[in-house]
């Protein structure tokens, strides 16, 4: 049963108190009508418990904004939202059209730098996040006393004589809850095996990211990508002041699953919500996404900390992944599923309970050295 404003109600009890479910939460479909976002279809979804997000149907149903009780939790890129027609496979297109948001999907054939190989040319972080969804649907589903808001669609990344990959995507949130569930299924609809690289570029920003913020990660190991990242090893998971001279730092993690099978990354700011504290927890299955990259970029305007679960441990892109023997491939008609959840925690009790629970699970792991990043 949904919990609304601190009290649990049955469907019958709620129905007696409201005219329509939208009085509490729901899905609103709209279209942008200005600038480079002109014509982009979108869904605004409210859980009725303080969680609100926007999914862009014409940008692979990626989530461009996330708020909790009116507090923005994610970074928005300076280029804003751009319609799919602004995509070009050059090196700078991703940066020009990168809206940031809760997550931008990188793939399906590549993440990392642009390049060319035996399978063809590919752009930085792939093409999928610039493709519009089809068969898009928004539903409100009652099952007994629980109510779920659901947005779904199919995104096709295909060309003649090339790849034919399909992404089936579903976003779900329950009425009265503060957890967004994401389920993706990627299928190779073509007749030949194809490269399949997938990364979820999750982007936490101000005010969740600020001077006193800290990112906690369940991992077995951590290493810097390069010399620049080495300089930030002592504060890799901390916020700080925006610095116009800041150079990006990327850290490579080996994820560790807790007893429930999911690895975690949690950004905490204990000063938000009038001092009660707010945290954003990202959970993912390391069997599906065995790599995690963390992007620390405390620049001016580009003030963001990225958490990036991926299905390949090679951040340097498809050409390098093939050289190292780490390039994932999809056989004809092969399907792979990916599940992530994004939960907002409010107050010291909820935050400390989450920290204590998976810290204990990590400490109990006996398969090798483990750590809760801090």
Model-derived regions: residue spans:
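Extended intrinsically disordered or low-complexity segments
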Residues: 244-246
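An amphipathic, aromatic/His-enriched active-site/gating alpha helix that lines ligand/cofactor pockets
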Residues: 201
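Surface beta-strand/loop "capping" patches
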Residues: 249-250
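Surface-exposed acidic/polar loop and edge beta-strand patches at domain peripheries
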Residues: 1-181, 193-195, 204-241, 254-374
């Amino acid at each position: 049963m949904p919990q609304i404003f601190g009290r649990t109600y049955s469907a019958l009890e709620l129905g007696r108190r409201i005219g329509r479910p939208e009085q509490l939460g729901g899905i609103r479909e709209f279209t942008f009508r200005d600038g480079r976002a002109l014509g982009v279809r979108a869904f605004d979804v409210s859980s009725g418990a303080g969680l609100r997000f926007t999914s862009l149907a014409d940008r692979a149903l990626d989530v461009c904004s996330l708020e909790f009780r009116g507090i923005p939790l994610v970074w928005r890129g300076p280029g804003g939202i751009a319609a799919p027609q602004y995509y070009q496979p050059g090196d700078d297109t991703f940066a020009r059209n990168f809206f940031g948001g809760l997550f931008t999907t990188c793939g399906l054939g590549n993440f990392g730098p642009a390049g060319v190989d035996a399978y063809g040319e590919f752009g930085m972080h792939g093409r999928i996040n610039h493709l519009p969804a089809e068969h898009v649907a928004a539903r409100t589903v009652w099952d007994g006393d629980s109510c779920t808001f659901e947005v779904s669609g199919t995104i096709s990344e295909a060309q003649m004589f090339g790849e034919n990959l399909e992404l089936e995507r579903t976003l779900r949130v329950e009425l009265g809850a503060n957890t967004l569930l994401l389920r993706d299924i990627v299928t190779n609809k073509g007749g030949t095996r194809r490269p399949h690289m997938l990364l979820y570029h999750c982007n936490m920003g101000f005010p969740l990211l600020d001077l006193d913020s800290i990112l906690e990660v369940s991992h077995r190991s951590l290493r810097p990508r390069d010399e620049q990242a080495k300089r930030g090893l002592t504060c890799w998971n901390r916020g700080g002041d925006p610095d116009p001279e800041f150079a990006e730092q990327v850290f490579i993690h080996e994820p560790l699953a807790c007893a429930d099978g999911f690895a975690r990354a949690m950004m905490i700011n204990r000063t938000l919500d009038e001092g009660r504290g707010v945290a954003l927890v990202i959970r993912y299955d390391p069997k599906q996404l065995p790599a995690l990259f963390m992007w620390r970029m405390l620049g001016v305007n580009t003030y963001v900390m990225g958490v990036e679960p991926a299905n390949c441990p090679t951040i340097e892109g498809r050409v390098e992944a093939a050289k190292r023997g780490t390039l994932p491939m999809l056989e004809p008609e092969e399907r792979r599923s990916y599940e992530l959840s994004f939960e907002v925690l409010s107050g010291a009790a909820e935050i400390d309970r989450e920290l204590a629970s998976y810290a204990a699970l990590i400490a109990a792991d006996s398969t090798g050295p483990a750590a809760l990043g801090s």
